Amino acid sequence: MRKIRTKICGITTPEDASAAVAAGADAVGLVFFQGSSRAVDIARAKKITAALPPFVSVVALFVNESAQNIRRILAEVPIHIIQFHGDEDDTFCRQFDRPYIKAIRVQTASDIRNAADRFPDAQALLFDAYHPSEYGGTGHRFDWTLLAEYSGKPWVLAGGLTPENVGEAVRITGAEAVDVSGGVEASKGKKDPAKVAAFIATANRLSR
C-alpha cells in the first residue's frame, strides 16, 4: 500500500496548524520569506510549532535567504526539513545539518530531467509551476504529464493543487507526496479547515 504524503504550507497560526494535523497532514510548512503574504517571524513560528504533536514534520521555506539568518532561525525554531525556493545551489542548501527539499520551477521537461543532477544532496525535489517573478504559492499549475514517466530522486508535487484537482494530479503524475497552500485557503494566509480536510481526505483515498 502506498501512502500519499501531504504537506499544508503557508501556516500562519497555531489554530491552522492544529486543524491541518487533525485532518491528517504529515507536515506543515512555515514561510520565512518576508516577500510572502504567508510569512511568519520567529516568535510566531515558535507558537505554531508548540501547538504540534510529535511525528508531524515542520518544514521551513526560504527564498534566497542568507546563511546567517537561516542558522538563526534553526537555532530557535524546531525545524525538521528545509525547503529552498530560490536560486540556491546544492552547496548552499546542504550546509545546515538538515535534510533539504529543493523546489524546481517547471517550464519544460528538461527542468525535471536535470534537477537531480543539479541537487544531488537533496532529500527530495519539489516540482512547482514556473512564474517569472514569484517563488511558489502562485496558484498556478504546470503540465502534469511531464512527470508521468519520471522515476528519479524522490519528489513532491506542488503548484495550483486544490481539493478538486489533487486526485487527477496524483493519477496523472503518480505523485506520492503533495504540497498545497493557496488551494486550501479562505484568504491569503488563512486556511479553510474544510478545504484542508477535503484535500487530505482525497489524498488518503488514493493511498491504497
Curated annotation (Swiss-Prot):
One Pfam family per UniProt: PRAI
EC number: 5.3.1.24
Keywords from the UniProt entry: Amino-acid biosynthesis, Aromatic amino acid biosynthesis, Isomerase, Tryptophan biosynthesis
Family matches, as InterPro entries: Aldolase_TIM (IPR013785), PRAI_dom (IPR001240), RibuloseP-bd_barrel (IPR011060), TrpF_fam (IPR044643)
Catalytic reaction list: N-(5-phospho-beta-D-ribosyl)anthranilate = 1-(2-carboxyphenylamino)-1-deoxy-D-ribulose 5-phosphate
BP-aspect Gene Ontology terms: L-tryptophan biosynthetic process
CDD domains (alphabetical): PRAI
Keyword Lyase among record annotations: no
Gene Ontology molecular function, alphabetical: phosphoribosylanthranilate isomerase activity
Domain of life: Bacteria
Pathway as given in its UniProt record: Amino-acid biosynthesis; L-tryptophan biosynthesis; L-tryptophan from chorismate: step 3/5
Family in the record: Belongs to the TrpF family.
UniProt-recorded name of the protein: N-(5'-phosphoribosyl)anthranilate isomerase
Biological classification of the source: Bacteria, Pseudomonadati, Pseudomonadota, Betaproteobacteria, Neisseriales
